[in-house]
Amino acid sequence: MFQLTFLGTGATVPSARRGLSALLVEHETDRFLVDCGEGTLRQIRQGGVGVRRLDRILLTHGHLDHILGLASLVGTLDLWDQADRLTLYGSEEALHIARVLLDQVVWPDDHPGLDVIYATLKPGRFCETGGVAVTAFPVCHHETQSFGFRFEETEHRPLDGARLDALGVPEGRERHELAHAGAVTLADGRTVRREDALGPAERGTSLAVVGDCGDADALVESVRGVDLLVIEATYRTADEATARSRSHLTVADACRLAQAAGVGRLVLTHQSDRYDPAEVEAEARARFEPVMVAKDFDRVEVRPAVRS
Protein backbone atom coordinates (compact mmCIF):
# COMPACT_ATOMS: atom_id res chain seq x y z
CA MET A 1 0.00 0.00 0.00
CA PHE A 2 1.13 3.53 -0.80
CA GLN A 3 0.21 6.62 1.21
CA LEU A 4 -0.02 9.91 -0.71
CA THR A 5 0.00 13.38 0.85
CA PHE A 6 -0.82 16.23 -1.54
CA LEU A 7 1.34 19.11 -0.33
CA GLY A 8 0.71 21.44 -3.27
CA THR A 9 -2.04 21.13 -5.87
CA GLY A 10 -2.03 24.52 -7.61
CA ALA A 11 -0.85 25.66 -11.01
CA THR A 12 1.81 28.26 -11.90
CA VAL A 13 1.47 30.56 -8.86
CA PRO A 14 0.43 29.83 -5.26
CA SER A 15 -2.98 30.99 -4.11
CA ALA A 16 -4.85 31.28 -0.82
CA ARG A 17 -6.24 27.78 -1.39
CA ARG A 18 -3.39 25.95 -3.07
CA GLY A 19 0.36 25.67 -2.84
CA LEU A 20 2.57 24.73 -5.77
CA SER A 21 3.30 21.23 -6.99
CA ALA A 22 4.55 18.77 -4.39
CA LEU A 23 3.41 15.23 -3.64
CA LEU A 24 4.76 12.95 -0.92
CA VAL A 25 4.65 9.23 -1.77
CA GLU A 26 5.26 6.87 1.15
CA HIS A 27 5.58 3.09 1.26
CA GLU A 28 6.50 1.53 4.59
CA THR A 29 9.81 3.26 5.44
CA ASP A 30 10.44 4.65 1.93
CA ARG A 31 9.59 8.28 1.16
CA PHE A 32 9.64 10.00 -2.24
CA LEU A 33 8.87 13.69 -2.82
CA VAL A 34 7.63 14.31 -6.36
CA ASP A 35 8.33 17.94 -7.29
CA CYS A 36 9.14 20.73 -4.87
CA GLY A 37 7.36 23.95 -5.76
CA GLU A 38 7.77 27.21 -3.89
CA GLY A 39 6.68 26.87 -0.25
CA THR A 40 6.96 23.08 -0.05
CA LEU A 41 8.82 23.21 3.27
CA ARG A 42 5.97 25.18 4.85
CA GLN A 43 3.45 22.71 3.42
CA ILE A 44 5.43 19.79 4.85
CA ARG A 45 5.41 21.35 8.31
CA GLN A 46 1.78 22.43 8.13
CA GLY A 47 0.74 19.01 6.86
CA GLY A 48 2.50 17.29 9.74
CA VAL A 49 4.48 14.85 7.61
CA GLY A 50 7.94 16.01 8.71
CA VAL A 51 11.27 15.79 6.93
CA ARG A 52 12.77 12.71 8.56
CA ARG A 53 13.88 10.02 6.10
CA LEU A 54 13.18 12.38 3.20
CA ASP A 55 16.15 11.45 1.05
CA ARG A 56 14.73 11.15 -2.49
CA ILE A 57 13.25 13.99 -4.54
CA LEU A 58 11.91 13.27 -8.04
CA LEU A 59 11.54 16.22 -10.42
CA THR A 60 9.07 15.96 -13.28
CA HIS A 61 10.72 18.88 -15.08
CA GLY A 62 12.64 22.08 -14.47
CA HIS A 63 9.97 24.78 -14.47
CA LEU A 64 10.26 26.95 -11.37
CA ASP A 65 6.76 26.24 -10.06
CA HIS A 66 7.90 22.62 -9.66
CA ILE A 67 11.42 23.20 -8.36
CA LEU A 68 11.85 26.52 -6.56
CA GLY A 69 11.07 25.09 -3.13
CA LEU A 70 14.30 23.08 -3.22
CA ALA A 71 16.25 26.03 -1.82
CA SER A 72 14.45 26.21 1.52
CA LEU A 73 13.78 22.48 1.85
CA VAL A 74 17.27 21.23 1.05
CA GLY A 75 18.90 24.05 3.00
CA THR A 76 16.82 23.08 6.04
CA LEU A 77 17.63 19.37 5.68
CA ASP A 78 21.29 20.38 5.82
CA LEU A 79 20.85 22.86 8.68
CA TRP A 80 18.90 20.42 10.85
CA ASP A 81 21.13 17.42 9.99
CA GLN A 82 18.05 15.48 8.95
CA ALA A 83 19.82 13.41 6.31
CA ASP A 84 23.36 12.43 5.38
CA ARG A 85 22.54 12.02 1.72
CA LEU A 86 19.88 13.38 -0.62
CA THR A 87 19.32 12.11 -4.16
CA LEU A 88 17.71 14.43 -6.70
CA TYR A 89 16.34 12.62 -9.76
CA GLY A 90 15.52 14.57 -12.90
CA SER A 91 16.43 15.36 -16.48
CA GLU A 92 19.76 17.04 -17.28
CA GLU A 93 17.84 20.28 -17.68
CA ALA A 94 16.03 20.05 -14.34
CA LEU A 95 19.15 18.99 -12.46
CA HIS A 96 21.15 21.87 -13.94
CA ILE A 97 18.60 24.33 -12.58
CA ALA A 98 18.56 22.55 -9.22
CA ARG A 99 22.36 22.60 -9.00
CA VAL A 100 22.52 26.33 -9.77
CA LEU A 101 19.83 27.01 -7.19
CA LEU A 102 21.61 25.06 -4.46
CA ASP A 103 25.22 25.91 -5.27
CA GLN A 104 24.74 29.62 -5.92
CA VAL A 105 21.85 30.49 -3.60
CA VAL A 106 21.86 28.02 -0.69
CA TRP A 107 25.59 27.29 -0.41
CA PRO A 108 27.44 30.07 -2.29
CA ASP A 109 30.39 30.19 0.10
CA ASP A 110 30.73 26.82 1.78
CA HIS A 111 30.30 23.12 1.18
CA PRO A 112 27.20 21.59 2.74
CA GLY A 113 27.36 18.77 5.22
CA LEU A 114 24.58 17.14 3.23
CA ASP A 115 25.79 14.94 0.37
CA VAL A 116 23.59 15.83 -2.63
CA ILE A 117 23.59 13.34 -5.50
CA TYR A 118 22.30 14.49 -8.88
CA ALA A 119 20.92 11.43 -10.71
CA THR A 120 20.10 12.04 -14.37
CA LEU A 121 16.97 10.25 -15.50
CA LYS A 122 16.44 8.27 -18.66
CA PRO A 123 13.29 6.32 -19.52
CA GLY A 124 13.15 3.06 -17.59
CA ARG A 125 13.48 1.74 -14.06
CA PHE A 126 15.82 3.89 -11.98
CA CYS A 127 15.16 3.12 -8.31
CA GLU A 128 14.50 -0.11 -6.43
CA THR A 129 14.10 -0.43 -2.69
CA GLY A 130 13.17 -3.51 -0.72
CA GLY A 131 9.52 -3.15 -1.61
CA VAL A 132 9.15 -0.59 -4.43
CA ALA A 133 10.38 -0.14 -7.99
CA VAL A 134 10.15 3.28 -9.67
CA THR A 135 10.16 3.76 -13.44
CA ALA A 136 10.50 7.03 -15.38
CA PHE A 137 8.66 7.60 -18.65
CA PRO A 138 8.84 10.59 -21.04
CA VAL A 139 6.13 13.24 -20.96
CA CYS A 140 5.50 15.94 -23.56
CA HIS A 141 5.38 19.49 -22.12
CA HIS A 142 6.55 22.43 -24.24
CA GLU A 143 10.20 21.87 -25.15
CA THR A 144 11.21 20.65 -21.69
CA GLN A 145 12.75 17.31 -20.82
CA SER A 146 9.88 15.99 -18.71
CA PHE A 147 9.16 12.70 -16.97
CA GLY A 148 6.32 10.92 -15.24
CA PHE A 149 6.83 8.24 -12.63
CA ARG A 150 5.34 4.79 -12.11
CA PHE A 151 5.60 3.25 -8.64
CA GLU A 152 5.08 -0.50 -8.26
CA GLU A 153 5.15 -2.67 -5.18
CA THR A 154 7.30 -5.76 -5.50
CA GLU A 155 5.22 -8.88 -6.10
CA HIS A 156 4.89 -10.79 -2.84
CA ARG A 157 3.57 -14.09 -1.46
CA PRO A 158 1.66 -13.73 1.81
CA LEU A 159 1.14 -16.46 4.37
CA ASP A 160 -1.85 -18.63 3.47
CA GLY A 161 -4.37 -19.24 6.25
CA ALA A 162 -5.45 -22.64 4.94
CA ARG A 163 -1.85 -23.86 4.77
CA LEU A 164 -1.17 -22.57 8.27
CA ASP A 165 -4.20 -24.48 9.54
CA ALA A 166 -3.09 -27.65 7.74
CA LEU A 167 0.39 -27.34 9.25
CA GLY A 168 -1.09 -26.87 12.71
CA VAL A 169 0.31 -23.38 13.33
CA PRO A 170 -1.90 -21.74 15.99
CA GLU A 171 -3.11 -18.18 15.58
CA GLY A 172 -1.29 -15.54 17.61
CA ARG A 173 2.36 -15.62 18.68
CA GLU A 174 3.38 -18.56 16.50
CA ARG A 175 2.06 -17.05 13.29
CA HIS A 176 3.58 -13.68 14.11
CA GLU A 177 6.96 -15.32 14.73
CA LEU A 178 6.70 -17.31 11.49
CA ALA A 179 5.91 -14.16 9.49
CA HIS A 180 8.75 -12.11 10.94
CA ALA A 181 11.46 -14.65 11.82
CA GLY A 182 10.98 -17.01 8.89
CA ALA A 183 10.45 -20.13 11.00
CA VAL A 184 8.72 -21.23 14.20
CA THR A 185 9.05 -24.27 16.45
CA LEU A 186 5.68 -25.61 17.56
CA ALA A 187 4.75 -27.15 20.90
CA ASP A 188 5.10 -30.67 19.45
CA GLY A 189 8.70 -29.96 18.41
CA ARG A 190 8.08 -29.54 14.68
CA THR A 191 9.70 -26.59 12.90
CA VAL A 192 7.62 -24.86 10.23
CA ARG A 193 9.39 -22.64 7.73
CA ARG A 194 7.78 -19.58 6.21
CA GLU A 195 8.14 -20.86 2.65
CA ASP A 196 6.09 -23.94 3.59
CA ALA A 197 3.07 -21.75 4.37
CA LEU A 198 3.14 -19.20 1.55
CA GLY A 199 0.18 -18.66 -0.71
CA PRO A 200 0.27 -17.79 -4.42
CA ALA A 201 2.06 -14.65 -5.59
CA GLU A 202 0.00 -11.45 -5.42
CA ARG A 203 0.42 -8.41 -7.64
CA GLY A 204 1.60 -5.36 -5.76
CA THR A 205 -0.15 -2.00 -5.75
CA SER A 206 0.82 0.50 -8.45
CA LEU A 207 0.41 4.19 -9.14
CA ALA A 208 1.57 6.71 -11.71
CA VAL A 209 2.28 10.41 -11.22
CA VAL A 210 2.29 12.84 -14.16
CA GLY A 211 3.20 16.51 -13.83
CA ASP A 212 2.70 19.11 -16.56
CA CYS A 213 1.70 17.45 -19.81
CA GLY A 214 0.59 18.51 -23.27
CA ASP A 215 -0.26 15.11 -24.78
CA ALA A 216 -2.19 12.62 -22.65
CA ASP A 217 -2.73 10.16 -25.49
CA ALA A 218 1.00 9.41 -25.62
CA LEU A 219 0.94 8.10 -22.04
CA VAL A 220 -1.53 5.22 -22.36
CA GLU A 221 1.04 2.43 -22.23
CA SER A 222 3.14 4.13 -19.56
CA VAL A 223 0.26 4.27 -17.08
CA ARG A 224 -1.69 1.22 -18.23
CA GLY A 225 -3.39 -0.72 -15.47
CA VAL A 226 -2.18 1.30 -12.48
CA ASP A 227 -4.39 1.27 -9.41
CA LEU A 228 -4.25 5.05 -9.18
CA LEU A 229 -3.24 7.80 -11.60
CA VAL A 230 -2.32 11.28 -10.35
CA ILE A 231 -2.23 13.73 -13.25
CA GLU A 232 -2.59 17.41 -13.99
CA ALA A 233 -5.84 18.81 -15.33
CA THR A 234 -5.13 22.51 -15.32
CA TYR A 235 -8.12 23.52 -17.47
CA ARG A 236 -11.81 22.81 -17.81
CA THR A 237 -12.68 21.21 -21.12
CA ALA A 238 -14.37 24.41 -22.33
CA ASP A 239 -10.92 26.04 -22.26
CA GLU A 240 -9.30 23.43 -24.48
CA ALA A 241 -7.77 26.00 -26.84
CA THR A 242 -5.94 27.68 -23.97
CA ALA A 243 -4.78 24.30 -22.66
CA ARG A 244 -3.33 23.37 -26.04
CA SER A 245 -1.53 26.69 -26.42
CA ARG A 246 0.09 26.26 -22.99
CA SER A 247 0.85 22.54 -23.26
CA HIS A 248 -1.47 21.49 -20.45
CA LEU A 249 -4.37 19.05 -20.12
CA THR A 250 -8.08 19.51 -19.74
CA VAL A 251 -10.34 17.46 -17.51
CA ALA A 252 -11.52 15.56 -20.58
CA ASP A 253 -7.92 14.75 -21.59
CA ALA A 254 -7.12 13.26 -18.18
CA CYS A 255 -10.34 11.26 -18.04
CA ARG A 256 -9.87 9.93 -21.56
CA LEU A 257 -6.38 8.73 -20.63
CA ALA A 258 -7.66 7.02 -17.48
CA GLN A 259 -10.34 5.24 -19.48
CA ALA A 260 -8.02 4.16 -22.30
CA ALA A 261 -5.33 2.92 -19.91
CA GLY A 262 -7.72 1.03 -17.64
CA VAL A 263 -6.60 2.71 -14.43
CA GLY A 264 -8.38 1.95 -11.18
CA ARG A 265 -8.79 5.48 -9.78
CA LEU A 266 -8.03 8.99 -11.00
CA VAL A 267 -6.84 12.01 -9.01
CA LEU A 268 -6.66 15.40 -10.72
CA THR A 269 -4.19 18.03 -9.55
CA HIS A 270 -2.31 21.16 -10.76
CA GLN A 271 -5.58 23.06 -10.62
CA SER A 272 -6.11 26.58 -11.90
CA ASP A 273 -7.56 28.81 -9.18
CA ARG A 274 -10.03 30.25 -11.67
CA TYR A 275 -12.32 27.24 -11.28
CA ASP A 276 -14.67 26.00 -8.57
CA PRO A 277 -13.27 22.58 -7.51
CA ALA A 278 -16.79 21.17 -7.13
CA GLU A 279 -17.57 22.02 -10.75
CA VAL A 280 -14.29 20.49 -11.93
CA GLU A 281 -15.06 17.29 -10.03
CA ALA A 282 -18.61 17.16 -11.39
CA GLU A 283 -17.29 17.45 -14.93
CA ALA A 284 -14.76 14.71 -14.27
CA ARG A 285 -17.33 12.36 -12.72
CA ALA A 286 -19.44 12.63 -15.85
CA ARG A 287 -16.48 11.24 -17.80
CA PHE A 288 -14.74 8.77 -15.46
CA GLU A 289 -15.23 7.21 -12.05
CA PRO A 290 -13.89 6.93 -9.43
CA VAL A 291 -12.22 10.34 -9.58
CA MET A 292 -11.37 13.15 -7.17
CA VAL A 293 -9.88 16.63 -7.43
CA ALA A 294 -7.04 16.86 -4.93
CA LYS A 295 -6.80 19.66 -2.38
CA ASP A 296 -3.75 20.65 -0.38
CA PHE A 297 -3.16 18.23 2.52
CA ASP A 298 -5.46 15.53 1.14
CA ARG A 299 -4.22 12.06 2.04
CA VAL A 300 -4.98 9.09 -0.16
CA GLU A 301 -4.24 5.42 0.42
CA VAL A 302 -3.46 3.45 -2.72
CA ARG A 303 -4.65 -0.15 -2.56
CA PRO A 304 -5.30 -2.65 -5.34
CA ALA A 305 -8.29 -1.37 -7.27
CA VAL A 306 -11.48 -3.40 -7.50
CA ARG A 307 -12.05 -3.91 -11.20
CA SER A 308 -15.16 -5.11 -12.95
From Swiss-Prot:
Active site: 65
Top-level division of the source organism's lineage: Bacteria
Co-factor remark: Binds 2 Zn(2+) ions.
UniProt cross-references to Gene3D superfamilies, sorted A to Z: Ribonuclease Z/Hydroxyacylglutathione hydrolase-like (3.60.15.10)
CDD domains for this protein: RNaseZ_ZiPD-like_MBL-fold
Known cofactor(s): Zn(2+)
Known catalytic reactions: Endonucleolytic cleavage of RNA, removing extra 3' nucleotides from tRNA precursor, generating 3' termini of tRNAs. A 3'-hydroxy group is left at the tRNA terminus and a 5'-phosphoryl group is left at the trailer molecule
Gene Ontology MF annotations: 3'-tRNA processing endoribonuclease activity; zinc ion binding
Pfam families listed in its UniProt record: Lactamase_B, Lactamase_B_2
Keyword NAD: no
Function: Zinc phosphodiesterase, which displays some tRNA 3'-processing endonuclease activity. Probably involved in tRNA maturation, by removing a 3'-trailer from precursor tRNA.
Assembly: Homodimer.
Homology family: Belongs to the RNase Z family.
Protein name stated in the entry: Ribonuclease Z
Originating species: Rhodospirillum centenum (strain ATCC 51521 / SW)
Gene from which the chain derives: rnz
